[in-house]
Amino acid sequence: MKVLWAVLVVTLLAGCQADVEPALEVGEPAPEVREPAMWQSGQPWELALGRFWDYLRWVQTLSDQVQEELLSSQVTQELTVLMEDTMKEVKAYKSELEQELGPMAEDTKARLSKELQAAQARLGADMEEVRNRLTQYRSEVQTMLGQSAEELRARLASHLRKLRKRLLRDAEDLQKRLAVYKAGAQEGAERGVSAIRERLGSLVEQGRLRAAQTSQPLRERAQAWGERLRGRLEEVGGQARDRLDVVREQMEEVRAKVEEQAEAFQARLKGWFEPVVEDMRRQWAELIEKVQVAVGASTPAPSEKH
C-alpha cells in the first residue's frame, strides 16, 4: 500500500507540470484535445463532470442552434446546473473519503485535505470561467462594437479550446489527488484494522488466561462443596435410617398393644354373652318341654270295642 501511495504521489506531481498554451490566431487549426473516456464510468463526480464536458463540446461546435441559444441565457443556465452538480458530487466524495481517514496522522490528513481543496477550487474556477466567457460573448454579439460576428466566433472558439484543455488538466489533477486521498484512507483503514486485530488478539489471550486463573479456584471450591454435600447427605441418610428403625420399633409396640387390647375386649365380650346365651338356651328348652306336655294332655285316649 505504501508503494502504491508513493507511485500515486509521483504521478500527481508529474501531472502538476502544466504547459502554458499559446494563444491561437483566428483561423489557426485547433490542437486535438483528448477525450476523457474515464469520466464515462467512474465516481459520481466524474460522471457529472463528463456531462459538463459533453455539453461544452457541443457548445464548442458553434452550430446555428448553439449560436441561437447563446444569444439567450439557455446555455449559461445549463452550464450552471451541470457545474453545481459536479461540485456537489466532488464535495460528497471528498467527505466520504475524509470519514475513512480516521487512523491517519493529523498533519498528513491536513496537508492532503489542503491540496485536494485547492485542486477542487481550480476545477470550479475553470467551469466558472467557461460560463463567464459565454456570457461575455453574448454581450459582445449584442453590442457588435466594430467587430464582425465571424471574428467574435473565432475568438470564442479559441478561448473555449484553451478553457477546455485547462479544464481537462485540472480535472485530471483533481482525480489524481483524490486517488492519493483514497489510498491514504485505505492505508489508514488497514492500519486501524491491523491495530484492532492486534488489540483484540491481546484481549482474547488475556481473557483466556484470566478465565483459566479464575476457573481453577472455582473448580476447587466446587469440589470442596461437593465433598461437603456428599458428607451431609450421608449424615442425613444415617439419621433417616436411625429414625426409621425407631419408628419401626414404635409401630411394633403399638401393634402388640392393639392385639392385647383386642384379645382382652374379645374375652370381655365372651364373658358378657356366654351367660346370656346359656340362659336363652335353658329358657328355650323349658319352652319346648311345656309345649310337648300340653300337646300330650290334649290328645284323647283310644276307645275299646266291645
From Swiss-Prot:
Position of the signal peptide: 1-18
Renumbered residue ranges of the record's region 8 X 22 AA approximate tandem repeats: 81-252
Record-listed Phosphoserine modification sites: 148
GO biological process: acylglycerol homeostasis; cholesterol efflux; cholesterol metabolic process; lipoprotein metabolic process; melanosome organization; phospholipid efflux
One Pfam family from the record: Apolipoprotein
Function: APOE is an apolipoprotein, a protein associating with lipid particles, that mainly functions in lipoprotein-mediated lipid transport between organs via the plasma and interstitial fluids. APOE is a core component of plasma lipoproteins and is involved in their production, conversion and clearance. Apolipoproteins are amphipathic molecules that interact both with lipids of the lipoprotein particle core and the aqueous environment of the plasma.
Protein name from the UniProt record: Apolipoprotein E
Source organism: Hystrix brachyura
Lineage per the UniProt record: Eukaryota, Metazoa, Chordata, Craniata, Vertebrata
Gene name of the encoded protein: APOE
